[in-house]
Amino acid sequence: MSAARQPSPTVRDKAAPEPAAPAAPKGARAPRARRAAPPHGVRPAPALAAEERARLLEGRHHDPHAVLGARTQRGGVAFRVLRPYAKAVTVVAKGLRTELVDEGDGLFSGLLPLTGVPDYRLLVTYDSDEIEVHDPYRFLPALGELDLHLIGEGRHEELWTALGSQPMEHQGVAGTRFTVWAPNALGVRVTGDFSYWDAVAYPMRSLGASGVWELFLPGVAEGALYKYEITRPDGGRTLRADPMARYAEVPPANASIVTASRYEWQDAEWMARRGALAPHQAPMSVYELHLASWRPGLSYRQLAEQLPAYVKELGFTHVELMPVAEHPFGGSWGYQVTGFYAPTSRMGTPDDFRFLVDALHRAGIGVIVDWVPAHFPRDDWALAEFDGRPLYEHQDPRRAAHPDWGTLEFDYGRKEVRNFLVANAVYWCQEFHVDGLRADAVASMLYLDYSRDEGDWSPNAHGGREDLDAVALLQEMNATVYRRFPGVVTIAEESTAWDGVTRPTDSGGLGFGLKWNMGWMHDTLRYVSKEPVHRKYHHHDMTFGMVYAFSENFVLPISHDEVVHGKRSLVSKMPGDWWQQRATHRAYLGFMWAHPGKQLLFMGQEFAQGSEWSETYGPDWWVLDSSYPAAGDHLGVRSLVRDLNRTYTASPALWERDSVPEGFAWVEADAADDNVFAFLRFARDGSPLLCVSNFSPVVRHGYRIGVPQEVGQWREVLNTDLEPYGGSGVHHARALRPEPVPAQGRAVSLRMTLPPMATVWLRP
């Protein structure tokens, strides 16, 4: 029932509800301390003690509801209102209209001869305006005891529903509940455009030992800008964005925005079937991109018109989005997050981002987002020393400071911080239907001595260098995500030999579904960057990955990190002239797509962009324009990537047994002088696929490749040297039949012509 339709107020002996957000006029001066003569027939309420009055006005009061609002006492009902800049405040109820006494400093009070607290509103008069509002200090807490209990335990898996700003109806009145965790604060006030950014009027109440502060503001609706003014333990004040904000201003502005989702998802079919296969037993080829620079200037909704069609045409099964959580500095590419619960507003609203994810799902494309639990920046309006003391960061400065990036590391041992991060992972999966989370910089979390000199770190309780708190966090996050969201995959960017990254948590592992194989990437790129004549001395770089290929469930990443900061683009790493560079680029991708592990390729590399990636300008799309003389060269590489993905997806041998030794067998691993590699992949039913790579610039005629005796013929299903891809066209037009000539330890072999700098796939 709305306030306007409520029956006549009954007498109460407790404060009731009904608030509304006042607004001080622009340009108003700070209120003067004055005590006006009381209106006719109105007695002032009993005066506040000097210390309590000071705490209220200075933002140090832990329970403003105890002194503001209305309550019964001897002689009637005492009203007290804090309205800076107001000329007068009048209590309005059915049969009642009484102006309160001006106590000075924006305080107004009155003791009215009533037997109970009525359902009242406040008529607030300013120099040039008069508004009628509900009193925020008549309301009971809008956060339940169960929420507080779960927050206190560090087990609130849907933390974003309890903390932050929540538009809602409370006690029959529409408004917004503001809640923030700030256990060290002497006081917290909420301010925003609804108060002309004056915080004095809206002190929040402390909800006991939880460390949570709460205030329900009637009349504050979606779209309102806000921040919290926190009084630190030293008495100073700091103005902060909401750590739980689900929407924020476009940087460099940094206020939080009240929001609620009304998006109606259209991806039910996708969500129902995405968990049919375990990710490591399903095809997965990932197109990594930076949303803001893929097509610079596009909004989320404009991206939804172009990105799904492009990715689907190329045959990728997933996209991986570099961090979309809000971040102040675009040059960080999103890896220095300040708004962990807010998709960046640079490209639109949270619902606009939902629209993009939905469009990708409807195109049959999974969505992985980069998630950054390792650190956060030091901006003084964000998380750093949020309530005046280390809160989200570790109390030990040596543990808090990230030595590589000048940022701060989370205190993984604090239950509320752990809850903040675990719930954040749940949030992206639940609220945005993402299909995977790639945890960034996991290695920096796992080791106490990561990038630290001796004396700059202290060992764990067992004397070791492992960060046991970080281990516990990652295990809890993975266990929670996999329990709640079947079909979602978590991926670790972990660059060390930590044992059990993708082992289940109940077996002592970290519990990730997949791990980036950084070692494979570095080794193989080192090989292909050498001149062909020198590659024989580095042959092991291409084979060593198989020594540990099944120790974890791997992703083979050619990511953004490999095409920036002087590392050159993928094609530019290759030696030789332009033809040789493209040929080696294509051969490498063919080798990579057939190798055990999932594939990841960063944007621009699918068409052999020659320059490094720029977050400002994005991929060099112009090289695909027909007016560019070499456009055909780049289009040829893109056509190859399309056919790699399509053939890969149609070949269960390449993904059904990706993480078990039975799915792979070397055929030729020792032909260092020839720069040749050959291996077999096997599907669950035993059907094979043969991959042969020749990384030398010469055609090798009559080359013997041993094959299984039971297969009667082999046909070429992919060849990176075909002319449409920009190759020389050396291929096998007809099926090849094994001959009874032993090779590589097998009784029969194929007599092949190996194209130069190329990879060939054959199937029965």
Swiss-Prot record:
Belongs to the glycosyl hydrolase 13 family. GlgB subfamily. Keywords: Carbohydrate metabolism, Glycogen biosynthesis, Glycogen metabolism, Glycosyltransferase, Transferase. GO terms for cellular component: cytosol. InterPro entries: A-amylase/branching_C (IPR006048), Branching_enzy (IPR037439), GlgB (IPR006407), GlgB_N (IPR054169), GlgB_N_E_set_prok (IPR044143), Glyco_hydro_13_cat_dom (IPR006047), Glyco_hydro_13_N (IPR004193), Glyco_hydro_b (IPR013780). One of its GO terms (molecular function) is 1,4-alpha-glucan branching enzyme activity. Catalyzes the formation of the alpha-1,6-glucosidic linkages in glycogen by scission of a 1,4-alpha-linked oligosaccharide from growing alpha-1,4-glucan chains and the subsequent attachment of the oligosaccharide to the alpha-1,6 position. The active site is at 440 (nucleophile), 493 (proton donor). This is 1,4-alpha-glucan branching enzyme GlgB. It catalyses: Transfers a segment of a (1->4)-alpha-D-glucan chain to a primary hydroxy group in a similar glucan chain. The keyword Transferase applies. Residues 1-46 are annotated as: Disordered. One of its GO terms (biological process) is glycogen biosynthetic process. Residues 17-28 have a biased composition (Low complexity). Its EC number is 2.4.1.18. NCBIfam families: branching_enzym, PRK05402.1, PRK12313.1. It comes from Kitasatospora aureofaciens. Monomer. Pathway: Glycan biosynthesis; glycogen biosynthesis.
